[in-house]
């Protein structure tokens, strides 16, 4: 049976971006002058995306509003996606083989579409 299509997650699968995502919470706390406990730091690296903002505000005491945190996430990831993001090692060769075989490829991500398009372009894989 021949592979006809493939769906890829973007962050951490196509792109080497997870370290940047993981450092956002701790960076925000440092900027607000808050020292995270080792347990809080561990939790920030393991929580689901939807749980990070409430955790930063309610448990860690980050004084920013939910919207301020969201705006900061978008701004910082846009900067990263515009200039620093790279594809995972070996990805371009793999995608080129799939393309050559006529496999339809799709990206599934929770990241905003504008940022997704920017990231894929910067990483040089938007043409797949």
Q: Locations of the language-model features?
A:
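N-terminal helical cap/lid subdomain that shapes the substrate entry/recognition surface
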Residues: 3-104, 114-117, 126
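Anionic-ligand binding region
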Residues: 120-121
């Amino acid at each position: 049976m021949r592979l006809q299509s493939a769906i890829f997650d973007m962050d951490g699968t196509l792109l080497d971006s997870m370290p940047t995502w993981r450092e956002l919470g701790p960076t925000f706390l440092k900027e607000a002058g808050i020292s995270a406990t080792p347990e809080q730091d561990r939790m920030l690296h393991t929580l689901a995306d939807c749980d990070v903002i409430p955790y930063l505000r309610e448990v860690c005491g980050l004084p920013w509003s939910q919207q301020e945190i969201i705006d900061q996430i978008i701004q910082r990831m846009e900067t990263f996606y515009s200039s620093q993001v790279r594809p995972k090692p070996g990805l371009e060769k793999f995608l080129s083989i799939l393309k050559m075989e006529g496999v339809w490829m799709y990206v599934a991500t929770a990241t905003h579409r504008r940022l997704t398009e920017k990231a894929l372009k910067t990483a040089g894989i938007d043409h797949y």
